[in-house]
Each structure stands twice: as C-alpha cells, then as structure tokens.
Amino acid sequence: EGIEYLLKAAKYVKELPERNDVFWGIVGGGPDLERMKKLCHEMGLDDIVEFTGRVPDQKLLDYLNTADVCVNCDEYNAMNDKSTMNKVLEYMALGKPLVQFDLTEGRYSAQDASLYAEHNNANDMARKILELLDNPEKRKWMGEYGRNRVINELGWEHTSKALLEGYDRYFRSRGK
C-alpha cells in the first residue's frame, strides 16, 4: 500500500514545532481506505490530512494542480521496484516535482524530477518533502524537467516503437 508511510511522514512534520503550514491531501480509493482513515485519526492527523476517496478525473486534476509537491508513497518491494507507476508520469506531465522512495523504475522514469527517500523510511520522505516545500525555485525546475521529460522522451510517440518491436521479437521467437 504505502499510505502508512505518508501518514508517518505527516506525523513527523506535524511534530516539528516550526511547521504548521503543511496540509496533506490523499486522493484515491481502494480496499484499505477506511483502515487508513482510522489510522490517520489514531495518529492525531485529522486536522492536517484529508482523504477524498475516489474522485472524477477533473476533480483529481484540480487537486493535483493545487499541490506544491506530489508524493508516490508506494513502498519498496520486489514488484514496486520494477513497476512503472502511472501517477509518477502523471505528476511529471503536470509539471509537479515529486518525492518517492528510491525504486529502480521510479528513478528511471522521474530522474531529476524527483527527490528519493531511503527505502520505506517515512522520516526521510518527510525531510525530502520539506526540502521541496522550502525551495520554490527547485520545485519549479524539477517540475519543468519532469514535464519536458514526459513530452520529449516518455510520451507514447517516443516509446511505442520500442514496445511494438519487443512484441514483434517475442512473437517471432515463438514462431507466430
């Protein structure tokens, strides 16, 4: 899941006496939503965390456009380490800087559009989020970098040829 790490990061930030300026919006649904809301309440974070549940695409876009930093909190494990997370590319396409755990595929996709926290370390994730919140110029540069990477390197028009060639090789090797 990973939301637990984001809640732990929020708690870390809330406990810093000088930080009362960070609000956490968690958009999306899933089977663990009610459990995460309960955990949030138990951690005393109701005043700084909002769970929206699943929202229509336009509302999702509205939420993302108000974010200063986007977070991919998918935990480090063997599957996530090698999986492309659509949200990473969506954040980049919107010109948003992001923070995520240091996953192989996440680093390949985002490159300099992201700061990378130590594997499954919520406090390090919190520190990286604060680093970006405190540096608007860095956020702007990272957001532009990510958007340009999506447009110039990761868009379908750039990746479809390699994908189709891979399928072609696979089917030829199977005699089809």
Task: Describe each model-derived feature in a short phrase.
Residues E1-Y12, P31-E34, N123:
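A conserved mid-protein helix/loop that constitutes part of the nucleotide-sugar donor-binding site
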Residues P17, D21, V27, E34-L61:
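Nucleotide-activated donor-binding/catalytic signature segment of Leloir-type glycosyltransferases, i.e.
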Residues L64-K82, K96-P97:
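Acidic donor-binding loop of glycosyltransferase active sites
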Residues S114-A122, E131-E137:
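Conserved acidic donor-binding segment of nucleotide-sugar-dependent glycosyltransferases
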Residues E137-R169:
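A charged, aromatic-enriched C-terminal amphipathic alpha-helix characteristic of glycosyltransferases
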